[in-house]
Amino acid sequence: MSEKKFRYVNPKPVRFGQATDRISQHSVPLYRCGPHVWNVGGQDDVCVYLLDTGEGLILIDTGYTESVFMVVHNIWKLGFNPEDIKKILLTHYHGDHVNGVASLVHISHAEVWLSREDERMHQLYSRADRHGMHTAPYTVTNFFDDNTPIVLGRFTIETKLTPGHAPGCTTFFFDDTDEETGKTYTCAVHGGLGIAYLRPDMLANQDQTEEAAHRFVRDCLELAERPVDINMPSHLNQADIDNNLPVDLNDYTWFVADYSWHDMLVNRAEAVKKFWPEVYPEYKNN
């Protein structure tokens, strides 16, 4: 059996988030990852997904203030108009995912969606830059409801609260159909898989308790069993995307890999278990 090309790898020591004044050294080309989905983020750290609904555009996350010009450039490059962004869906409140919101809303007047849990954290950070994480000002207009999908054009997006990396991380599931082939693909974007804040000594950083770590493990293992055709990670390293881009950047079928979602989530669950060996005996002597 050939080696799996998509797998979790640790973040690079220096990526765009640590070098926001050096975009040329940390750029990633625009690529298509679903029939009507592209990563327009333009840098080697946080993904920004553009969904063409046929009735306007949806963005999942916005990246950094310093890279938002690449998002706008890539949207134009695809032949779309940034003014047609209707909804901005935020996986969580951390600055590397939300700091482009204000600029994009200024252009488009789009709705801004976030979980209620992370809006509370957003307000705490916006007042004091708590814990050293800068969050640029923006206004949330809508809150996710896991019982009510977000519908626009061809897309019906299911949301699921998946706390851990932040209290209000939200995961997205949606189907995307290729009209030329008739094939429909189930796609997923996890809301946040960084696990440093789930260490016993770091939980307070995100105002969380030990239960957050154990819920993260349970959620990852449960969601890993959901069939997903195309895994769209929120950071490129979570599926080693930037080292595995296709020669044809328009060939989204390159990313069809039914193992990628499952393996990524199991990897993160097992990593968190190691922080809590007294709870997970299989790691007691590791």
Model-derived segments and their meaning:
Residues 66-67, 76-149, 256-258, 263-268:
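Active-site HxH/HxHxD metal-binding segment of metal-dependent hydrolases
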